Each structure stands twice: as structure tokens, then as C-alpha cells.
């Protein structure tokens, strides 16, 4: 099982400058590159300081000039926010500039806050339908001379300009959860990205079950790869692990508040949650975070990751967005590289 870093600029306070957050994100990616991680993933979000990521291709092009070896992945572009011709062209240009280091992760999106601003009236179902129309379209645009008459997009015969360096195209990954999304990915020759979010390892097993069932159903298609994304913290003591569980619990409370889309947003920042609100959450608790997420000293983390490797996961992505200080993120990532990854070499 190989390892990657999943990272964004995350701004939780107006005291943090966006330039500093960008520089810190780049430094974490450079640590991952020097440390032998396989890839860096960064995604797309709009008008949210919680996850500042208006166009992942911009970040990846910059990273290509500041790293040497890591694959550079979109984790993920949000299909309904793109036109197929624009996505095919920007992805192909990124592949050329990065000298063939691009992986493309694509998702339907998750936040109604973004949907109502980017595609008013769209719900999660129709976002998923756009994803299913998008992937065959961009593949055909890269082949060239492709005419499209779909439900959401129509255009006459077109060839992506440019076409990607990697042939027939960069690896495509689909963010999947339910059985249908796994089946769509496998049937279309795409790799799969999954995350249990805050849930425990029974969810990790369930997601692998969906993937295996899809591979069995479409056994005529070469088996794609599957990546597991989890919030991870490699601690230097149990006290440090407990602090991380508290911090990740706070992160998930804010994640949930953005997801519900009911709280006031001012200057791109959501209204702060009080300690009482965080403590009253029905299922986000520090105890659940400590148990479910990959939080612990090196040996505990190794044991968890060995179990995921045995399940059949090809890649484990270290989700570092946690609301922690840069110093704590950096220390955890360095312990991951120095104390955990060598066991899997």
C-alpha cells in the first residue's frame, strides 16, 4: 500500500492571512515529496474559507515546479461546476505542464452552500447525473472529433486542445460511496476514492465491499485501484493523541455546520461555534474521533494501516485538514514519513 497527502488551505479565523496559508500548504506538499509519498491531492471549493480551493489545477501547476517526484492529483474537481470542453482542456494542459504527473479525481460535490451559488436549483442527485455525463465526455474529447448530445451539455464535433501527455489519458478517479457510484466507476474504467469521514472501520470494510462487488459485477473490465482517505494524526504521546482527537472533533463540528448550510457566513467565514454547541453535538465527540479516525502513536497507526492494506486498499491518503496549527500538522506528517511509512516499504 502506498501513501499520499490530501491537503487544502483551511482558514478558521480572520487572523490567518491567505498568503501564509498557501505557503504552509506548499511546505507540507514539499515534505510529502521529499519523504517519498506517492502523490499529493487537493480539491475544488468555492467561496468557503473553510476550504480555500477555487481551482486545483492552479495549485498543481505551482506544485509541479516546487516538487520533484509526487504525482499531482485533483481531490476532487466538482463535475457540475465545469463544462466538459473546459475541464478536458485545463486537465490536459496541466498534464503537459506537470510532465505527465497528473491524476484527475472527479466528484459530484457535497455542499449545498456551493450548489446554490454555482448551479442554483441543483440537488445532489442531478449533480451525480452530471458527473456520469462528464467522464465519458472528457475521455472522448481527448480522443478527438467528438460530438456530444447529452442531458446537460450539447456541442458539435470537438477535439480537446491540448490533448494530454499521458496516453490515452491521465488516471481518472471517482469519489464513490454507495454501490451505484462504485459500479459506475468500475464499469467506466476509473479508479475509486472513498472516505468514511468520521465513521469507524466497519464503514471502511463496507466501502471495500461495495468496490469488490462492483469489480465482480464487471469482471470483464481490468480491476481498477481504490484509495482510502482518512483523517490521520501520528502522535508523540497518548496526551498528544487526545489533543488531536479534540481538534479533529472541532473540525468535524465546523464541517457539519457548513454541510447543514444554516449558519451565518460573513466574509467567507462561518459564525463561530461555542464550546457548548460543540459539546452538545449528538455524534461528534472527542471519544468517537479518537476511536474512529487514525489517531495514535506510530505503532497504533501502523496496526490500523496494516488492516487497511489487508482489506485490499492500494493507496492510503493522509487527510491533514484538521484545523490544527501548521506546526502540529507538520510534526504529525514528519512522524508519518519517518516512523510509519518505512514499515510498508
Where do the language-model regions lie?
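Hydrophobic faces of well-ordered beta-strands that scaffold small-molecule active sites
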Residues: 3-7, 40-42, 72-74, 102-106, ...
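An alpha-helical appendage that flanks or caps ligand/catalytic pockets
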Residues: 5, 124-161, 202-313
Amino acid at each position: 500500500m502506498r501513501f499520499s497527502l490530501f491537503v487544502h488551505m483551511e482558514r478558521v479565523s480572520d487572523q490567518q492571512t491567505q498568503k501564509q496559508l498557501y505557503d504552509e500548504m506548499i511546505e507540507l506538499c514539499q515534505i510529502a515529496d521529499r519523504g517519498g509519498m506517492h502523490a499529493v491531492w487537493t480539491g475544488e471549493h468555492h467561496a468557503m474559507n473553510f476550504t480555500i480551493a477555487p481551482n486545483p489545477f492552479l495549485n498543481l501547476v505551482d506544485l509541479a515546479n516546487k516538487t520533484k517526484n509526487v504525482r499531482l492529483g485533483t481531490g476532487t474537481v466538482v463535475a457540475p461546476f465545469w463544462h466538459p470542453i473546459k475541464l478536458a482542456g485545463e486537465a490536459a494542459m496541466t498534464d503537459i505542464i506537470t510532465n505527465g504527473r497528473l491524476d484527475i479525481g472527479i466528484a459530484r460535490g457535497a455542499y449545498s452552500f456551493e450548489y446554490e451559488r454555482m448551479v442554483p436549483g441543483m440537488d445532489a442527485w442531478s449533480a451525480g447525473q452530471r458527473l456520469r455525463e462528464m467522464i465519458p465526455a472528457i475521455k472522448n474529447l481527448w480522443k478527438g472529433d467528438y460530438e456530444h448530445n447529452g442531458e446537460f451539455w450539447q456541442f458539435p464535433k470537438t477535439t480537446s486542445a491540448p490533448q494530454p501527455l499521458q496516453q490515452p489519458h491521465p488516471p481518472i478517479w471517482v469519489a464513490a460511496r454507495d454501490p451505484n457510484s462504485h459500479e459506475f466507476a468500475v464499469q467506466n474504467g476509473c479508479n475509486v476514492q472513498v472516505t468514511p469521514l468520521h465513521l469507524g472501520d466497519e464503514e471502511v470494510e463496507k466501502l471495500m465491499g461495495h468496490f469488490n462487488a462492483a469489480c465482480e459485477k464487471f469482471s470483464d473490465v481490468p480491476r481498477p485501484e481504490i484509495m482510502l482517505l482518512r483523517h490521520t494524526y501520528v502522535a508523540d504521546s497518548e496526551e498528544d493523541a487526545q489533543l488531536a482527537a479534540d481538534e479533529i472533533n472541532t473540525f468535524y463540528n465546523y464541517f457539519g455546520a457548513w454541510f447543514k448550510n444554516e449558519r451565518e457566513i460573513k466574509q467567507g467565514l462561518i459564525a463561530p461555534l461555542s464550546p457548548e454547541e460543540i459539546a452538545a453535538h449528538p455524534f461528534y465527540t472527542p471519544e468517537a474521533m479518537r476511536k474512529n479516525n487514525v489517531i495514535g502513536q506510530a505503532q497504533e497507526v501502523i496496526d490500523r494501516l496494516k488492516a487497511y492494506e489487508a482489506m485490499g486498499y492500494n493507496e492510503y491518503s493522509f487527510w491533514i485538514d484538521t484545523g490544527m496549527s501548521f506546526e502540529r500538522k507538520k510534526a504529525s506528517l514528519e512522524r508519518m514519513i519517518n516512523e510509519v511509512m518505512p514499515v510498508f516499504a
